[in-house]
């Protein structure tokens, strides 16, 4: 189950997301990363008009992502889709849109033996000037995991075990 929460003064926050057994897998404002919540785009190292921008660490105020408008819903026997537009700004130095993003969230219309949603994000420049996304070791679509993943067992080991799609542990 996923619930979206929207306010005109903030970005779209898509949370909580749960496993089929009901365990919440997304989190927000974790003590070690208080600037992350739900599902979001993390363009960590970028430039607009030769000035640094960042959409990962909100405390720096070098970038902001805001809900702009609800574009509508489509409902039929197969699915329900919601569409929203967000705008990215360069934060405190440039409050005008530099990037537009459309989210389309589709949920199957029939009961399935599992929970599922499809999220499509389309991003495009909002000005003639491009947002330059620089190479970095992380970035793009991100998920703020549940803070329970950071809890330690009796031996001081993380209770959560994160592996890549290749079955590798990132540590």
Feature locations, PLM:
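Residues that flank catalytic or metal-binding motifs in active/ligand-binding sites
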Residues: 13, 117-119, 137-139
